[in-house]
From Swiss-Prot:
Protein name per UniProt: UNC93-like protein MFSD11
Membrane-spanning residues: 8-28, 53-73, 74-94, 96-116, 138-158, 170-190, 239-259, 277-297, 309-329, 359-379, 385-405, 410-430
The gene coding this protein: MFSD11
Residue(s) carrying Phosphoserine: S204
Subcellular location: Membrane
A GO CC term assigned to this protein in UniProt: membrane
Principal location: membrane
Length: 449
């Protein structure tokens, strides 16, 4: 297998492993609040929104140290260990208790920080300026396929149900736990690129032994250097501007992954299909994500206009979706009680419009995330772990804040917050992309996704 083929193989395995893990986790997140509402009529008392706020809050704080962890342990083992914690969190829903539910939320927050920093590092070392766009698109399309498979099962399994029984819950979460473990094991199929694991012609085995002996001493240096680089990158102009865009992706991630499905499941006017529509919504979010990732990956070699048109498409698609959601859903849908809401929207609530908005949310999200992955890999190819850690730090802290306020804010206020951040995030991304293009024009090669 040629070096380039091996790198492409690694990207595909990375995407497939994440597809399995997040088939389980994103399906879990999509139905968590609905499942917990059913559980709250028993001895269990908890909130899916609060759990997600804990996860993303711990996630954001943990990103400060994850570059050091990945530098010492390596991306492959980091992702495997993180996958075990993801599986543990999902397994908690088989027989949940408040203490285990919230404790697992803390652990998965730490694991998520390690996982995504390692993913960014793995993506970057298996790419160059020519392939980063293509590889970002391939990874994103495979990752977001997870939304399709898990939610397809939810749609058929929960069709016609207004309450989630104990048997239904256990069946779903046992299956999701197994799926997550399969993805975790797949990380062991990722190979080191030839440039990292093949000795040069002039390098003897004695030289290699010397490197092994020195590696323990170098680990501490690597950890400290990675920690310092994270703080230095935080205050660069480009990273500060991209942080506004990243903040928006955190807010809209919370909305489409947790809040929107809950809104659909709370609208009593949708009738007996309201719970199964949560699964259908997730499927169409996934279709939008897959379409976007695949399309931008295929166009990466031919797009001469840079990343900005894709981001512009993303914000326009999202603004259309937000407006339709504002018209189609009652304002109290995100915070409705277990019995749901009978409130009226500005128009007659339509299942078809709700599902269309799911597709638009997924498509717009893929526009932003593929371009952020691409530009980070391009600008910070030498400091990928710290750069992706900062990206996930900002994204996750905003997601945590959004999950927290989702317990209290009516729908139209949540939409307004996203519109404001989306507008300024788009402008800030444009600024960084223009500067990147100017830098390339002065002598470096350039490929946009």
């Amino acid at each position: 297998m040629s070096p380039e083929s091996k790198k492409l193989f690694n990207i595909i395995i990375l995407g497939v492993a994440f597809m399995f893990m997040f088939t389980a986790f994103q399906t879990c997140g999509n139905v968590a609040q609905t499942v917990i509402r059913s559980l709250n009529s028993t001895d269990f008392h908890g909130s899916g929104y609060t759990s997600m706020a804990i996860i993303y809050g711990v996630f954001s704080a943990s990103n400060l140290i994850t570059p050091s962890v990945v530098a010492i342990v390596g991306p492959q083992l980091s992702m495997f260990a993180s996958g075990l914690f993801y599986s543990m969190y999902i397994a908690v829903f088989i027989q949940p208790f408040p203490w285990s539910f919230y404790t697992a939320s803390v652990f998965i927050g730490i694991a998520a920080a390690v996982l995504w920093t390692a993913q960014g590092n793995c993506l970057t070392i298996n790419s160059d300026e020519h392939t980063i766009g293509r590889n970002s698109g391939i990874f994103w399309a495979l990752l977001q396929s997870s939304l399709f498979f898990g939610n397809l099962y939810i749609y058929f399994a929960w069709q016609g149900k207004t309450q989630i029984s104990e048997s239904d819950r256990r069946t779903v979460f046992i299956a999701l736990t197994v799926i997550s473990l399969v993805g975790t094991v797949l990380f062991f199929l990722i190979r080191k690129p030839d440039s990292e694991n093949v000795l040069g012609e002039d390098e003897s085995s004695d030289d290699q032994d010397m490197e092994v002996n020195e590696s323990a001493q170098n680990n501490l240096t690597k950890a400290v250097d990675a920690f310092k680089k994270s703080f230095k990158l935080c205050v660069t102009k480009e990273m500060l501007l991209l942080s506004i865009t990243t903040a928006y992706t955190g807010l809209e991630l919370t909305f489409f992954s947790g809040v929107y499905g809950t809104c659909i499941g709370a609208i009593n006017k949708f009738g007996a299909e309201e719970k199964s529509l949560i699964g259908l919504s997730g499927i169409f979010i996934g279709i939008g994500e897959i379409l976007g990732g695949s399309l931008f990956g295929l166009l990466s070699k031919n797009n001469r206009f840079g990343r900005n048109p894709v981001v512009l498409l993303g914000i326009l698609v999202h603004f259309i979706a937000f407006y339709l959601i504002f018209l189609n859903m009652p304002g109290d849908a995100p915070i409705a009680p277990v019995k749901g809401t009978d409130s009226s929207a500005y128009i007659k609530s339509s299942k078809e419009v709700a599902i269309l908005c799911s597709f638009l949310l997924g498509l717009g999200d893929s526009c932003f995330n593929t371009q952020l992955l691409s530009i980070l890999g391009f600008l910070y190819s030498e400091d990928s772990a710290p750069a992706f850690a900062i990206f996930k730090f900002v994204q996750s802290i905003c997601a945590a804040v959004a999950f927290f306020y989702s317990n209290y804010l009516l729908l139209h206020w949540q939409l307004l917050v996203m519109v404001i951040f989306g507008f300024f995030g788009t402008i800030s991304f444009f600024t960084v992309e223009w500067e990147a293009a100017a830098f390339v024009a002065r002598g470096s090669d350039y490929r946009s996704i």
